[in-house]
Amino acid sequence: MKANLGNLMKQAQQMQENMKAMQEKLATIEVEGQAGAGMVKVIMTCRHDVKRINIDSSLIGDDKEMLEDLVAAAMNDAVRRVEAATQEHMASVTSGLGLPAGMKFPF
């Protein structure tokens, strides 16, 4: 029984180290969200830090409301891409845990 508990503790510590390493890696991965056929782009890290927003010069001076909508859409696209990239990378860390399908980690 003690051997199993010791083994479990060792696995938990290794998992914690792997999670920390993955979080550091995710902080360096950038994704790009787009809207308006690429006329508005948002570059974001997998920590949800916005690095850049690129707006095509043809949109400057146009309808302010439309531009705001495009920026919001590009941000939302970037967030969805961050979530997908994060899940993909975290799958390598959590694959041996036997978590139920659809269960997100970290919770």
UniProtKB/Swiss-Prot annotation:
Keywords, in A-Z order: Cytoplasm, DNA-binding
Name used for this protein in its record: Nucleoid-associated protein Neut_0591
Biological role stated in the UniProt entry: Binds to DNA and alters its conformation. May be involved in regulation of gene expression, nucleoid organization and DNA protection.
Entry similarity comment: Belongs to the YbaB/EbfC family.
A GO CC term attached to the entry: bacterial nucleoid
Taxonomic lineage of the native organism: Bacteria, Pseudomonadati, Pseudomonadota, Betaproteobacteria, Nitrosomonadales
Location relative to the cell: Cytoplasm, Nucleoid
GO molecular function ontology, one term from the record: DNA binding
Description of how the protein assembles with itself and partners: Homodimer.
Coiled-coil parts of chain: none
InterPro entries found in the cross-reference section: YbaB-like_sf (IPR036894), YbaB/EbfC (IPR004401)
Pfam families the record matches: YbaB_DNA_bd
